[in-house]
Amino acid sequence: MLVCPKCHRLVHAEDLKRLAAEAERSEQANDLTGALSKWREALEFLPRDSRQHQTISEKVAALSAWVDSGALPPSGKSRPSPSQAAAAKKTRLGKAWAWTVAAVVLLLTKGKLLLLGLTKAGTLWTMVLAFGVYWTIWGWKFAAGLVVSIYIHEMGHVVALSRFGIKASMPMFIPGFGALIRMKQHPASPREDARVGLAGPLWGLGAALAAYGIYELTGAPIWAAISQVGAWINLFNLLPIPPLDGGRGFRSLSRGQRWIVVAAMAGMWAVTKEGLLVLLVIVAAWRALSEKTKVEPDQKGLLQYTLLVVTLSAMCLIPVPGMAPPHDTSPQQQGSGQ
């Protein structure tokens, strides 16, 4: 009960005052994520049809936009965005070393959050269970690589949710179905939902690139296999249907932008002949045709979606030593029975 039926006053008025004060302090300290978390919590104590709920919802949407931009509101001190900081540190390393360095940077900058899930019993035990199931099918080395790849993908979602101040559970592994995260609060806008949704494949792409970098350095075929399968799983997640990540990423795109994604999918199918892309093209084209969107064009979302389609599709072609190259139709690979 949020409102007293007799006096019509808010039941949680004191909690609302406390949360508002904490949110204001966080904003003054330029802690936008902390402010978002407090304002979202305050929404839970307000009737949805109240003016206060509408006002705070608008506040959440505004703060979310600032978090997404990587900048601070005009009253705050300026700071470089994550992309600017990364660009300043970029060096002219070789391909393999660049991928390995990127993985190390990810571990150093996000290591605390990346390892956070392992401190939760539910995540750790379901992770071990999934590892055991996959071990019996593919062996322990591939099973370990697959589970870690899925874990990194899911922690991408966790980090994005934390960045926007959205409460959620840690990953829970389900053998054969990957893993899932339960959101305790909902994104405030299609763009926010898209950032959270595409964060998983983006981190998954990083894991696949790191595995391929290790393969280039060591020559061990198992790393090529982990990289290729990880890329395929993340590409599958880009199917633009709920509740997959692609369905969430598609929400923020205008109709014109959706057709650009369809063109990218079709173009990568022409290059790679990856059968999964046919399904992606069909579903994405159907949504672009059948749905009328009223959202403003989302350039960042379009860039992320297109980047993921192109890179993950290309990585599905990674050759694994000892296995036939993907889509090889030569007579030697087809077999003549001789």
Which residues does each PLM region occupy?
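Hydrophobic transmembrane alpha-helices and their immediate loop junctions
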Residues: 61-338
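Conserved small-residue packing positions in alpha-helical repeats and bundles
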Residues: 23-24, 61
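Cys/His-coordinated zinc-binding microdomains
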Residues: 5-11
